[in-house]
Structures are given as structure tokens and as C-alpha cells.
């Protein structure tokens, strides 16, 4: 850009000189025109300044012709300010302008305006590829438009002047604007013609700091179109102001303030009301509102997941002043996502974002689909089967793989720019967002026709997409296979419960079930086995017999490696990326553990680096074994077309949709990487040929149908038994095989639903070469391995495969990791904590990791004694049946001790334990078993705890020892807590001893079990990234059962599977009662319903007895015992009385024993409510004026009533003078008037009210004059209740017999008053 400006500088200088002459002639050579002011602060109006267009870096003498040395130096300073211009520096620039002398402004006023112009100029660069002739249009030389030309060229001069000094600061600053004038002129014309502008997401990157960041030229063009509109409007104002100024006189002595005007105060956009996240049901109307302010009014754009939204029939964008709204007329699943609103003006940008969740889907559902479709489209041509006898040359498939990865990498960059609301660390990046299983699938065993439920829990941000697979085949939601996914109840508990319900299982449903959760940050899977017991014995050996199907493999026996021994190796290719080691991940059913695949693709790793061993994908078990489509080094290839390891593998997909083989390879890479740390590679490589390669295929594979063994001189052979079966092996040119590695095939027999692991105990030693024979007669062979200098040649071994068409070997070729791999990459980062092969020895007798149950050492010794003997086909056939029987037994039964047996619990028990774990993971804990401390704000990469090995269920007899063992990994090292039946076990507990090893293995040991130890044991691991737990059940049986169990343990090896299966229910029939749920002490109200609920387990189902204070509770009208379908027992008491208070004890009893719990029930007395009742009514009375009078009444009620007094139906306030109200606890109420006046005469009413009701009574008060004596009425009245009534009725004057104070107790009782009061 700078070079273009320099090359065009000469023509600019010439144009400015011509413009200067034309302007001088137009002004009549008036000297005052030099000081002509401009009304637009963004431009300048000096003809001399216009002529100063000297251009290049080497044309400074041209500038000196128009400027003095002092002005030239000042131009340099102002040009530097123009490059580094920042809106926050306006005040400093204003002061700088004031410091210029009037003389300088008179001769060079352009210098005063230069900073103001450059404020907008950096936002107006355009393409520099336009024709240079654009600057020489005739309109710039016209005298009629000389003012406009002068103003435009003067602005260009400042830009040209600034370009002279860019080279001095280019090493520390790359200017974002001030490109050459040719492209700018054309861009301005385009803006005037199109009257449109485009705004990019990259507008967020506009810096307000004094040092701008580099921005590509193509993005700068889009960044400034809006600013050009503002600038064009100012230019039009400048033309009008200039024409007005041309008619007036401007003297050289004008005030400097007249040379420029202050720019209107502006402010960047700011959202006063931000968008709010919402969750709405599908089909409803959604509206997002925000309010943004800014000067000038900002331009607003809407985006959904990084894509700009425009007005359409479905989406309406409305602006009402500062209020901006986005309305979705009808929301559907595809509308779920993150919506952002960006506002920008020439002073800056601002944005706000919100998540829209459509009920029933997650925000991640709208992501990843294009990549998935693209991957499927690329993979479809590769899913082609070849005949068994087809030979093919295997070309590298790197170009295809590179095309596969190109698009996702771009998507990753866009996703990183979009705002997120994930948990962030100190660096502002998400700590971790990959999915994590907080509850994994459990292995299940069921009978035909039963209901089976697989359940797991997963969390991740954004919400992961969950898919279910059976033997690698995707399961769709159907009436037979119901897929349920419960969304998080709140943001505080982001767990999703994923469930697969099989309404009715059959024998063919047996197999491996996988639940895969994925979002844009990674993929994680949980695997479990389902075993369906059919009507026939699935282990019938006769169904597995075959005549002539054998497979021979050369392998290396595990043996201790000398500290300085050099394992055979070869030279590495330039950049080996994806590596693996052949490992058997299938254990016997009795000890199989949950498989876990985790793909940690952390945001800080998405920076354009190549995919390599740093890809961070780890897996612990291979899934989808029947899938023909395989992947090597991240590439999708056909089975007979593996890629060459010489080529560099493509980068990792941004949203990986990994199949089982790729995950298996990456996991094996971690295993071998740690193994190499323990066995360093040699300094001098030597050749180590190993056939069955699919990663290095420079020669065509030798494929033959002969049933004989075929020896190939090279190690480039590759064969297929059937198009579906795939045999990868080690890499010829990139293998570093340590003496402790032991490749083992894992065979899967789908029709019989039994997985068999080929152990070394059943392998027969053969010649030092490798052969692989299949029913089709295809053969794969390896040459003998040359011995190492310090290592004897390991004897290879052979195993036989009956009925080869029913097995599919599942293995991954071991390719070592480069010794120069960075430790910072996720693979090396996880290699120290994830499952690995121990150094010495790496495997047990079965070729499994040492933690798996191994076979008797005697059997291994017997096999080793036969190792020097050659083996032929006859010997293999003779031992075939024995091998099959041994494999079946070792897969089906675990090698357990008589006193500690592992067993399988029912699905009901499993769900109960899941409930306990779910509650514990959300309950505060008291203490941990160790002194591990975690930072409040974690730093670096963090990984939530993961169980590499889970707790098992044990059945022991009283007095026997038992040990619960599991292995936990996580970063940072998790804290560990142990619980029994939901109650935390203290680390000071002497009975239960807790231990923790350095490799993450945790154990709980009970030396001598008692009946109280029976229950559920749970271990919970926690670190700042989350919590995870798993449980194991301990069944403690009484001594009479021990002999039966011992005999069963001694004879179970000689029984068939049918007998073993028939025997299991007999053992499970004796299950001591165990309370899974029990109520605590309760307080209940008398007269209400009281319910005591408990849940108990046991076989046979126990009987419950309730005791109250030691006496049995018998069922009657108010006491009922109920049992619900869920197994909850309830004692109902309705209504509750005081007699029901006391200590309750519930006893559960069955054949094996009993269990009980107690609680205290307190009964709160029932509150008595009674409506008010008048015991003594108000009495009519009359008193002389001036005397006191008392109106009395007595009312009772429960609770005590509240009294209200009224006179002539108007409430009497308590503050009225001469009137006071009194009452006591006995219900006595009194209204005292002292002294009485004429105005007090009238009808008085007393109302008594409580919660139960209200009652009232009324009486008449008469006031007489002092001389008046009451005359008895002529008519007879009934006797009054007053003690003075009889005297009054006889005409006696009571007032004459008592003092004035005593007269207040007198009640007048005329017949009229009494009768009327009674009626009221």
C-alpha cells in the first residue's frame, strides 16, 4: 500500500500544482484566498496547501517549494498524529491546534485541520488494485468545479503527506487506513451511486487504543463504508460553505478561531437495554428488544449464530427511535441459537447477545449439521465393498482428507468470534465446554421379554446432542426403542438425563450399546453391554465348531525390559500425527467396566494449528465394530485404501464427528505415549518389518485365495476375509515396538451375543512368523523379527478362530508417538492420568491391563512350557474345542475368591443407587479423605473427574474382608468422599479404611464385615470442574448361607452356563432386608392425616411390622398399612389423635434376618374454635344529664372475640372524649360515658367477632334533665334480669338511694325498652 502511494506521488504533485494555478486564476490572484476558512472541520482550504502534493519518499524538495522548514517539521508531527489518531485524544489535539501561531495558520491552515480529517480517514480505505487513471478524470481540472476539486485534493494531500512517514513506524504499527488516493476516490463515487453500506462482523475489532492492530486489506474495505457516508455528507456541506466564503473578504489577519470550527460532540454506541435470553415453546412468537444510544445514531445489524439476519416474512426487524426489535413470527427448532445485535458508528461499536431456546431442543442442535452433511457426502463414495479375491493398489488419500477439513476449520474461527456465555477463566476463554458424563451407562442383564432401561446423565455447554448406537448402528426413536432426553431443570443444574427404553428385549438385542454426546467443543461416549438370557443355552460349543478356520499372529510376550535395552525401531516419518497401540479393551463380563470416550477440544487450542497428536482425543474402548467405514490419521478412507504415513495428516475437525476407529486410535496413541516415557526410544534405529500394514502401502497388497500359508518378502501385505472385515496392523516405517507390547485380537461374535477375548492362555506357539487365515483363504504373513542387540527374539504365538465368518477382529495398528511431541498438547496432557499400560509387565496373563482379573498362573506356566514346540494345523484343530470352552468360561465367569463374590444387582436397585448419587452430588460435604486443596479460581486446563474404573457389587459372608476399588482421573486432582447409604464415612472411621494411590486408585477396605455393613457404598470425586459419583452394593449374608455359597464357588467352574443361570435366583432369594428410605422424627397436627413412608429391599420381599411404644399397631378405621407399586410402604393415620403420639418402630423381616428403624411422632393439640355467645346482654337504661352511665355485656368464645361498639349504626372511635371502653379475659365488656349529655342518647350496639363467628346485641340509652323523675309505665312488664329491675318496676327512685358513682350500676328497665331490645 505504501509503495503504491509513493509511485503515484509525482502525478499527485502535478495535479495539485495545476489545481493551484486554476484556483489562483479563478480568485483573481487575490492573496486573501490563501487564508480562506473552511466551514467543514474535516477539510482545509489553502491553495498553497493544495499545491503541496509532493509525493514520494524521495521528493522532499517538492514539498520545500511550498512549505518552510518549520512548517515541514510541523507537517511531520501532525502526520504522525494522523496515523495514530484516537478519538479519546481530541482534547490534546485541540490544545495542539491552539499552540500554533496565527502566522502559521495563515500560510498553512491545512495543518490545523489535518488531525480532524484523519479522524475519519482511517475508516475509508478501498481497494488499491483500481486503475491509476481514475485519478486523472477531467472533472478535477475544470475551473467551474475548482473549489470541489481543491477540497478533495487537499484532503488527498494530507493522506499523501501521512504516507511519507508510514515507513518510519511500520515496524511497530501497521496503519489500518490512509491508503492511496486513487482507490479512495473511486470508493467515494461508489458510495454516492449505490447509497449503501455493508457491515461485517469484524467491526467488533475496531480498536480505540492508540496503537491499532493489523487488519487485512479486504476486511478494511468493508469496515469503513458507513463512515464514508458520513464523510460524503460533510463534503457536501463543505462545498456550500466554501462557495459562501468565496464571496466574502477574508483578511490575512483573521483570528485563528475563524479558520476552523469545533466538531460536534460524538459518542460511541451503548446499549441501555440489552437482549434477554428466553425459552419458549415451539410455534410461538418471539420478540427480542434492545435500546441503543449513540451520536451519530448507530447502525444496527442482527445476527444469529454468526449469520446476518434481514427482513423476511418470518423475521421482522423494526426500529422505533432508539428501540430496536427482532420478531420471529413463529419459532421452530431451527430458530434455536444465540442472537446478537451489533450497533456501530464512526466512534465505535457495541453489541449484546441472548440465547433463544425452543422447548425440546438445545442450542447446539442448530450447529454442526452442515459439517455432518459434508462429511456424510464425502464418506458415501468410500463405503464400497470389494470382493474377497480383489487385489488393489492403495494410493494415499491425503488430498481428499484435506478437502474434508477445510470447511470446519473456517467454522471454528467464526465460532470463536461469536459471544459466549460459558464459564470463563482469567484469560477470558471458556475453562471447558466439552460434554462430560456425570452418570454413565451400566451393564445390564435381562431375560427375554423384560423391559430394559439404559440411563445416563451428561452436561456440557452448549447443550450436547445425544445419539444412541447398538453395535455401531444408530438407533432411531421408535415404539420398540424409545429415546428420552430430559433437559436441565435450571442453569444451576445443567445435567441432562438421557434414557433409552427397550419395551421388550430379545436375544438378538444383546450387544454393546453406546450413548454419544457431542457439541462443538468435543464428544464423549458411554458404553454398556446388554446380555439377554434366552430359552436356549447360548454357550453351546457345538454351534461354534468349524473345520478349517485358523488365524496365526506373531506377537511379543510381555516380559520385563532391561533398563538400557534398546527395543527395535525404525526411522520416523517427518511428522507422524495419529498413533495407536494394539490393546484389548474388552474384559470378561463379570468385570467389564464402563467405556468412556472423551474429546477435549479446548478453545485455546483452536488457533489454526495442524491436527496431530495434540488433537486431544482420548478413548478407552472401541465402539461401532460393525462399521465398514474406518478412519486413519483423521481421514475418511475405504478399507482397502489406507493413507500413506509420509503425508501429513489434515487438521482436526472443528466439530468432530468421529467414528469408533479414529477414537480408538487416538486413545491408543495416549497409551503408547506414556509407555514410551517409561521405555525411551533407542538412538540408533534398526529395521523392524511387521506386516499387516494399512498405513504404509507403497506396494500393492498380495491377496491370494490359497489355503496354504503364503510368505511375502516384504511387509506390505493386506488381506480381507470378507469386505466387511478389516485387519489393520502396525506401521512398517513408523513403528517403535517396545518389548513389553503385546498385540491381541478382540473377537466379536454377534449371532451368539458372546464376546470372546483371546487370551494368551489359549494361544499356541508357532514359527517366528505371522499368518492370518480366513474362511476365504486370504492370508497375511509377517517375516521373522530380527533380534535386538540386548534382547532375545520373543516367541510369537498363534490362536485359532472357529467359524471365522462369525467373528470380526477389532484392533488398531500401533503407531508410536513422536518423541518430540510437545508436552503441552492435550494428548500428552492427559496421558499421565488416563488408562495406560503398566511398564513391567504391561499386561496380565490374558493380555488385558493388569487391573482386569487374570487367569491362574498355573495355566500360564503350562502354556509357557509348550512354547518351544512347533504347532501345525492338526494340533490347532485338536485343541479347538478346549480353547472355545476356556474362552467361554473366562468371559462368562470371573475368577473370584470364595469369600468375595461379585454379582449383578437388579435394575430397581440400580435406579435407587442412581437416586442416591444424584442427591449426593448436590449436597454439601463435610470433609475429604485427603489434604488436597483446590484454588478458588482454577488456572490452566481443567478436566472434570472421570471414573476409569468403577466400583463393583460384592456378596460376602459375615466376617469376611471386602475391598471396594475404583480409579479416578481429573485435572486438578479431585477430592474424594465415601458414603454409606447416603451418609458420609469419616476418614477417622477405624472399621472402614480408605486409601488412595498416586495413580488415582481409591479403595475402601473392611477387614471383617458384619450385618451392619450391608448397604450401598458410594464414592464421589469433586474438583472445580464438577462432581461425579458411582456406587457399589455390599450384600452381607449370614453364616448358614456361607456353606452353600462356598460349595457353589468351588463347583461353578464345572457347571454349564444353564446351571449357573438357574442357580443365581436361588442365591438372590436370600437377601437381608435393607431400608432404602426411612422417615425421621415428625410433628403432626391433631385431627389431620399423618403418613409414614419407607422403602425396603430384600429377597424374599420382607414383611413389615409397626410398633407404637412397643405395642403392635393393628389396622383399623384410623390406621391403614399400604404398599405401592414402587415398593414404598406407608402407615396412614387419619384422623390423628393424641393417643397416636409416641415412638414408632418399623421392623422388616424375611428368611435371612430383619432390619428396623425408629422415629418419634409428636402430636400438636387441635385448636378449639367456638363462635361468640352472649351470656349477659346490654340493658336499656336512662340517666340524668351529667351523670356517668355504664353499658355492660358478657360474651365468651374461642379464641376470645374482639369487641366493636356502635351508636346509631356508626362506629364509636376509641379516642372520643368522655367515652372509654373496657374488657377483661372473662368476656366482660363495658362502655363508660362520663359525664352523659343529651347528645349521648340513642341506640348502642356491641358486636363480638372471632374466627368462628360473630354475635351482636343492642340497647337504648336515654338522658333526662336534672329535675326529671322517671315515671313507671302503666303496663306490666316481665321481670328484668337486672338486680335493680324489681325496685324500678315498683316506682322506687334508685338514684336517690345511691351516690352518683354508684348510680352507674343502675339499669333502667321500662317495658318498652326491654321488649324492643329483646326483639333486636
From Swiss-Prot:
Biased composition (Low complexity): 240-258
Entry GO terms, CC: axon; cytosol; I band; intracellular membrane-bounded organelle; nucleoplasm; nucleus; plasma membrane; Z disc
GO MF entry, a single one: SH3 domain binding
Residues with Phosphothreonine modification: 251
Effect noted on mutating residue 955 to W: In CMD1KK; uncertain significance
Coiled-coil ranges (or none): 219-248
Subcellular location field: Cytoplasm; Nucleus; Cytoplasm, Myofibril, Sarcomere; Cytoplasm, Myofibril, Sarcomere, Z line
GO biological process, one term: sarcomere organization
Key words, A-Z: Actin-binding, Cardiomyopathy, Coiled coil, Cytoplasm, Disease variant, Disulfide bond, Immunoglobulin domain, Nemaline myopathy, Nucleus, Phosphoprotein, Repeat
Residues covered by region (Disordered): 19-68, 84-145, 165-271, 554-655, 763-805, 844-876
Family: Belongs to the myotilin/palladin family.
Function of the protein: Component of the sarcomere that tethers together nebulin (skeletal muscle) and nebulette (cardiac muscle) to alpha-actinin, at the Z lines.
Disease linked to the protein: Congenital myopathy 24: An autosomal recessive muscular disorder characterized by slowly progressive muscle weakness and atrophy, mainly affecting the lower limbs and neck. Some patients may have mild cardiac or respiratory involvement, but they do not have respiratory failure. Muscle biopsy shows nemaline bodies. Cardiomyopathy, dilated, 1KK: A disorder characterized by ventricular dilation and impaired systolic function, resulting in congestive heart failure and arrhythmia. Patients are at risk of premature death.
Subunit structure: Interacts with TTN/titin, NEB, NEBL, ACTN2 and CARP.
Protein name: Myopalladin
Organism annotation: Homo sapiens
Taxonomic classification: Eukaryota, Metazoa, Chordata, Craniata, Vertebrata
Gene: MYPN
Amino acid at each position: 500500500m505504501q509503495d503504491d502511494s509513493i509511485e503515484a506521488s509525482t502525478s499527485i504533485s502535478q495535479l495539485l500544482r495545476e489545481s493551484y494555478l486554476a484556483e489562483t486564476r479563478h480568485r483573481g490572484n487575490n492573496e486573501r484566498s490563501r487564508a480562506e476558512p473552511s466551514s467543514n472541520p474535516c477539510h482545509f482550504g489553502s491553495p498553497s496547501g493544495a499545491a503541496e502534493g509532493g509525493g514520494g519518499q524521495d521528493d522532499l524538495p517538492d514539498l520545500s517549494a511550498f512549505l518552510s522548514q518549520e512548517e515541514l517539521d510541523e507537517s511531520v508531527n501532525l502526520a504522525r498524529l494522523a496515523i495514530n489518531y484516537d478519538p479519546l485524544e481530541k482534547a490534546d489535539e485541540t490544545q495542539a491546534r491552539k499552540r500554533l501561531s496565527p502566522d502559521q495558520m495563515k500560510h498553512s491552515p491545512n495543518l490545523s485541520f489535518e488531525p480532524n480529517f484523519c479522524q475519519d480517514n482511517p475508516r475509508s480505505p478501498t481497494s488499491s488494485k483500481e486503475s491509476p487513471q481514475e485519478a486523472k478524470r477531467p472533472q478535477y481540472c475544470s475551473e467551474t468545479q475548482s473549489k470541489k476539486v481543491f477540497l478533495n485534493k487537499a484532503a488527498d494531500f494530507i493522506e499523501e503527506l501521512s504516507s511519507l512517514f508510514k515507513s518510519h513506524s511500520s515496524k511497530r504499527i501497521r496503519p489500518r487506513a490512509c491508503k492511496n488516493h486513487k482507490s479512495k476516490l473511486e470508493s467515494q463515487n461508489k458510495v454516492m451511486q449505490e447509497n449503501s453500506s455493508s457491515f461485517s462482523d469484524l467491526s467488533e475489532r475496531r480498536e480505540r487504543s492508540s496503537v491499532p492492530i493489523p487488519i487485512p486489506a479486504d476486511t478494511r474495505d468493508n469496515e469503513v463504508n458507513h463512515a464514508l457516508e458520513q464523510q460524503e455528507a460533510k463534503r457536501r456541506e463543505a462545498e456550500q460553505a466554501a462557495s459562501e466564503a468565496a464571496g466574502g473578504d477574508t483578511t490575512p489577519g483573521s483570528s485563528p478561531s475563524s479558520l476552523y470550527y469545533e466538531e460536534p460532540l460524538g459518542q460511541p454506541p451503548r446499549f441501555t437495554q440489552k437482549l434477554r435470553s428466553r425459552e419458549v415453546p415451539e410455534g410461538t412468537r418471539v420478540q427480542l428488544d434492545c435500546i441503543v444510544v449513540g451520536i451519530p445514531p448507530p447502525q444496527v445489524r442482527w445476527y444469529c449464530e454468526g449469520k446476518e439476519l434481514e427482513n423476511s416474512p418470518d423475521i421482522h426487524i423494526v426500529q422505533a427511535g432508539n428501540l430496536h426489535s427482532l420478531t420471529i413470527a413463529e419459532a421452530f427448532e431451527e430458530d434455536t441459537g444465540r442472537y446478537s445485535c451489533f450497533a456501530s458508528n464512526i466512534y465505535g461499536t457495541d453489541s449484546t447477545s441472548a440465547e433463544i431456546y425452543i422447548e425440546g431442543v438445545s442450542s447446539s442442535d442448530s450447529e454442526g449439521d452442515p459439517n455432518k452433511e459434508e462429511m456424510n457426502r464425502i464418506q458415501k463414495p468410500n463405503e464400497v465393498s470389494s470382493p474377497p479375491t480383489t487385489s488393489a493398489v492403495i494410493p494415499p488419500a491425503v488430498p481428499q482428507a484435506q478437502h474434508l477439513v477445510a470447511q470446519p476449520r473456517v467454522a471454528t474461527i467464526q465460532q470463536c468470534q461469536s459471544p459466549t456465555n460459558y464459564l470463563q477463566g482469567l484469560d477470558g476463554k471458556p475453562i471447558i465446554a466439552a460434554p462430560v458424563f456425570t452418570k454413565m451407562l451400566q451393564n445390564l442383564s435381562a431375560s427375554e421379554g423384560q423391559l430394559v432401561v439404559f440411563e445416563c446423565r451428561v452436561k456440557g455447554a452448549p447443550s450436547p446432542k445425544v445419539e444412541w448406537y447398538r453395535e455401531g448402528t444408530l438407533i432411531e426413536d421408535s415404539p420398540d426403542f424409545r429415546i428420552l432426553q430430559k433437559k436441565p431443570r435450571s442453569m444451576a443444574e445443567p445435567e441432562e438425563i438421557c434414557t433409552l427404553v427397550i419395551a421388550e428385549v430379545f436375544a438378538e438385542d444383546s450387544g454393546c450399546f453406546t450413548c454419544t454426546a457431542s457439541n462443538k467443543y468435543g464428544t464423549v461416549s458411554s458404553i454398556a453391554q446388554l446380555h439377554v438370557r434366552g430359552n436356549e443355552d447360548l454357550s453351546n460349543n457345538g454351534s461354534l465348531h468349524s473345520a478349517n478356520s485358523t488365524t496365526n499372529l506373531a506377537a511379543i510376550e510381555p516380559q520385563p525390559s532391561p533398563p538400557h535395552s534398546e527395543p527395535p525401531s525404525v526411522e520416523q516419518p517427518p511428522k507422524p500425527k495419529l498413533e495407536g497401540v494394539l490393546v484389548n479393551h474388552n474384559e470378561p463380563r463379570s468385570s467389564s467396566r464402563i467405556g468412556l470416550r472423551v474429546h477435549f477440544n479446548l478453545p485455546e487450542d483452536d488457533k489454526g494449528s495442524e491436527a496431530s497428536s495434540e488433537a486431544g482425543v482420548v478413548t478407552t474402548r472401541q465402539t461401532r465394530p460393525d462399521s465398514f467405514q474406518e478412519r486413519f490419521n483423521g481421514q475418511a478412507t475405504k478399507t482397502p485404501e489406507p493413507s500413506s504415513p509420509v503425508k501429513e495428516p489434515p487438521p482436526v475437525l472443528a466439530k468432530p464427528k468421529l467414528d469408533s476407529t479414529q477414537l480408538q486410535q487416538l486413545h491408543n496413541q495416549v497409551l503408547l505415549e506414556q509407555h514410551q516415557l517409561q521405555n525411551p526410544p533407542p538412538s540408533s534405529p534398526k529395521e523392524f518389518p511387521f506386516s499387516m500394514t494399512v498405513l504404509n502401502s507403497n506396494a500393492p497388497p498380495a491377496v491370494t485365495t490359497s489355503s496354504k500359508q503364503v510368505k511375502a518378502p516384504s511387509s506390505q501385505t493386506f488381506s480381507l476375509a470378507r469386505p466387511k472385515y478389516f485387519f489393520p496392523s502396525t506401521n512398517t516405517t513408523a513403528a517403535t515396538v517396545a518389548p513389553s507390547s503385546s498385540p491381541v485380537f478382540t473377537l466379536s461374535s454377534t449371532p451368539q451375543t458372546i464376546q470372546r477375548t483371546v487370551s494368551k492362555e489359549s494361544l499356541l506357539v508357532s514359527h517366528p512368523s505371522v499368518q492370518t487365515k480366513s474362511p476365504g483363504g486370504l492370508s497375511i504373513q509377517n517375516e521373522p523379527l530380527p533380534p535386538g542387540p540386548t534382547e532375545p527374539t520373543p516367541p510369537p504365538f498363534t490362536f485359532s478362530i472357529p467359524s471365522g465368518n462369525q467373528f470380526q477382529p477389532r484392533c488398531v495398528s500401533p503407531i508410536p508417538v513422536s518423541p518430540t511431541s510437545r508436552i503441552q498438547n492435550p494428548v500428552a496432557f492427559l496421558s499421565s492420568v488416563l488408562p495406560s499400560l503398566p511398564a513391567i509387565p504391561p499386561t496380565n496373563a490374558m493380555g488385558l491391563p493388569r487391573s482386569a482379573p487374570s487367569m491362574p498362573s498355573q495355566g500360564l506356566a503350562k502354556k509357557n512350557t509348550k512354547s518351544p514346540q512347533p504347532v501345525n494345523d492338526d494340533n490347532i484343530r485338536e485343541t479347538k474345542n478346549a480353547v472355545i470352552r476356556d474362552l467361554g468360561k473366562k468371559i462368562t465367569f470371573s475368577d473370584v475368591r470364595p469369600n468375595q463374590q461379585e454379582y449383578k444387582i437388579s435394575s430397581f436397585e440400580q435406579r435407587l443407587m442412581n437416586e442416591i448419587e444424584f442427591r449426593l452430588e448436590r449436597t454439601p460435604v463435610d470433609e475429604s479423605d485427603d489434604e488436597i486443596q483446590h484454588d478458588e479460581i482454577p488456572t490452566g486446563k481443567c478436566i472434570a473427574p472421570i471414573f476409569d474404573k468403577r466400583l463393583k457389587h460384592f456378596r460376602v459372608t459375615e466376617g469376611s474382608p471386602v475391598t471396594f476399588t475404583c480409579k479416578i482421573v481429573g485435572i486438578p486432582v479431585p477430592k474424594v468422599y465415601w458414603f454409606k447409604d447416603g451418609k458420609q464415612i469419616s476418614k477417622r472411621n477405624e472399621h472402614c479404611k480408605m486409601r488412595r494411590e498416586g495413580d488415582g486408585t481409591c479403595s475402601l477396605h473392611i477387614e471383617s464385615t458384619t450385618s451392619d455393613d450391608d448397604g450401598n457404598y458410594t464414592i464421589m470425586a469433586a474438583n472445580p470442574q464438577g462432581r461425579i459419583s458411582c456406587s457399589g452394593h455390599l450384600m452381607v449374608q449370614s453364616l448358614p448361607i456361607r456353606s452353600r455359597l462356598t460349595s457353589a464357588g468351588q463347583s461353578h467352574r464345572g457347571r454349564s452356563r444353564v446351571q449357573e443361570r438357574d442357580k443365581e435366583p436361588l442365591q438372590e432369594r436370600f437377601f437381608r432386608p435393607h431400608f432404602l428410605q426411612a422417615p425421621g422424627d415428625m410433628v403432626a397436627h391433631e385431627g389431620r392425616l399423618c403418613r409414614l413412608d419407607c422403602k425396603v429391599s430384600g429377597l424374599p420381599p420382607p414383611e413389615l411390622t409397626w410398633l407404637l411404644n412397643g405395642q403392635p399397631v393393628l389396622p383399623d378405621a384410623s390406621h391403614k398399612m399400604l404398599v405401592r407399586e414402587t415398593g414404598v410402604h406407608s402407615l396412614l393415620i387419619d384422623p390423628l389423635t393424641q393417643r397416636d403420639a409416641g415412638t414408632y418402630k418399623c421392623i422388616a423381616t424375611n428368611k435371612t434376618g430383619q432390619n428396623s428403624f425408629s422415629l418419634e411422632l409428636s402430636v400438636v393439640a387441635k385448636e378449639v374454635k367456638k363462635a361468640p355467645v352472649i351470656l349477659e346482654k346490654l340493658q336499656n337504661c336512662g340517666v340524668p344529664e351529667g351523670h356517668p352511665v355504664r353499658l355492660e355485656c358478657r360474651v365468651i368464645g374461642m379464641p376470645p372475640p374482639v369487641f366493636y361498639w356502635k351508636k346509631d349504626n356508626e362506629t364509636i372511635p376509641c379516642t372520643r372524649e368522655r367515652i372509654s371502653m373496657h374488657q377483661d379475659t372473662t368476656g366482660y365488656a363495658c362502655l363508660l360515658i362520663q359525664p352523659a349529655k343529651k347528645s349521648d342518647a340513642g341506640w348502642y350496639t356491641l358486636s363480638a367477632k372471632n374466627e368462628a363467628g360473630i354475635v351482636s346485641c343492642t340497647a337504648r340509652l336515654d338522658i333526662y334533665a336534672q329535675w326529671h323523675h322517671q315515671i313507671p309505665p302503666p303496663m306490666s312488664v316481665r321481670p328484668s334480669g337486672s338486680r335493680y329491675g324489681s325496685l324500678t318496676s315498683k316506682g322506687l327512685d334508685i338514684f336517690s338511694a345511691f351516690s352518683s358513682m354508684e348510680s352507674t350500676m343502675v339499669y333502667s328497665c321500662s317495658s318498652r325498652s326491654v321488649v324492643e331490645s329483646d326483639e333486636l
